[in-house]
Amino acid sequence: MGEQQKMTIEEAIAILDPETRRAALFGYRYFGGFRGSEAVLAATEEACRVAVRVMQEYLEKKGGEPT
């Protein structure tokens, strides 16, 4: 991925939630140096990375073991 763009937790939720995914991804015609379907894929992958980070932080706070 070219330039790194920061994605908020709220943006990641909107992309990953089936109820809001289509509308959220509409604005991602350009993302991370990509365009079109590659930009949508890059945004979705970044949303997944954000979600994984949040879940790992949650597990650490709960005393679980992150992977």
Segments from the language model and where they lie:
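Short interaction-hotspot residues at assembly and binding interfaces
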Residues: 1-3, 11-65
